[in-house]
Amino acid sequence: MVSYKEAGVNIEEGYKSVDLIKKHASKTFTKGVLNNLGSFAGMFELPKYKNPVLVSGTDGVGTKLDIAFRMKKYNTVGIDCVAMCVNDILCHGAKPLFFLDYIACGKLESEIAAQLVEGVSNGCIQSECALIGGETAEMPGFYRDGEYDIAGFAVGIAEKDEIIDGSKIEDGDILIGIASSGPHSNGYSLIRKLVEDLHKDFEGNKIGNTLLTPTKIYVKPVMKLLEKYNIKGMAHVTGGGFYENIPRMFKEDFTAVINKKSYPLPNIFSHLMSLGIEEDHMYNTFNMGIGFVLCVNEKDGENIIKDLIEMGEKGYKIGYVKKGDKSVELI
């Protein structure tokens, strides 16, 4: 007789990982959570809204995971997973409510799975949403031993008449960029081609550790700004860089004019460029130091930047909007 364990699936290790995961998930629970982990589904009670709209998003971490495997550092990529999802739904003015994760592997190691979920828990705490469920799939022969994949799904909420969809953007509005923490979770297939030695020194740290800096979560500062200002459009700068993401906030035909010298370029991007990437390709791949963009009235720009600084963020007036063709113009 052949057992499930002999086929490559260790049920006992699965039980152990669930126990380790529960303690991390419980730290994220908010008032709307109605049940604990372990049921067939997570339940969440909607807060009191007049005309609520649920806003959802899903994403993964991509090949940044390979850096984590090679550095044997697993507790940060979970933050990336949450960030990629909640920053997306934030673009429409949605407050994150809850999150679910999916972890797949060839051979389950409970301690590694727990570290991954520790990162997810940390990301949920940063974005004030609850981790109410998830799935860990052990698939021997499908993934190589030691390899994991992680993806997530976020649900947020917004009042229907407060949804930000770019319809109020006007010619002459300005663009405020909020600093990123590094490449975030995009461009890593290219990075892995260029950076072979992850233990090489970069500004007093191993470059592998620098590249594992978690994606910045913008929920708290942006939600505070939404309470005070008329923010007309927002963009999460992910894969495709400036060119792909900034025009996504436009409902009409506008062009975003971005001044490359309006903010300091982080050294990690200068270093990557020095390894052989053309500048235009950099802006079409990476966030180039700006992880989130706000479109606002010019009169509000100075105060928004001041408020961002007071909240510990770095904000810059990086450009403006003009009539065009849903494009980006770098100057």
UniProtKB/Swiss-Prot annotation:
Keywords noted in UniProt: ATP-binding, Cytoplasm, Ligase, Nucleotide-binding, Purine biosynthesis
UniProt xrefs under Pfam families: AIRS (PF00586), AIRS_C (PF02769)
Subcellular location(s) of the protein: Cytoplasm
Reactions performed catalytically: 2-formamido-N(1)-(5-O-phospho-beta-D-ribosyl)acetamidine + ATP = 5-amino-1-(5-phospho-beta-D-ribosyl)imidazole + ADP + phosphate + H(+)
GO biological process: 'de novo' IMP biosynthetic process; adenine biosynthetic process
Gene Ontology cellular component terms for the protein in this record: cytosol
Molecular-function annotations in GO: ATP binding; phosphoribosylamine-glycine ligase activity; phosphoribosylformylglycinamidine cyclo-ligase activity
Top-level class of the enzyme under EC nomenclature: ligase
CDD domains linked to this entry: PurM
Enzyme Commission designation: 6.3.3.1
Involved pathway(s): Purine metabolism; IMP biosynthesis via de novo pathway; 5-amino-1-(5-phospho-D-ribosyl)imidazole from N(2)-formyl-N(1)-(5-phospho-D-ribosyl)glycinamide: step 2/2
NCBIfam families, per the entry: purM
HAMAP family: AIRS
Homology family: Belongs to the AIR synthase family.
Descriptive protein name: Phosphoribosylformylglycinamidine cyclo-ligase
Provenance organism: Clostridium botulinum (strain Okra / Type B1)
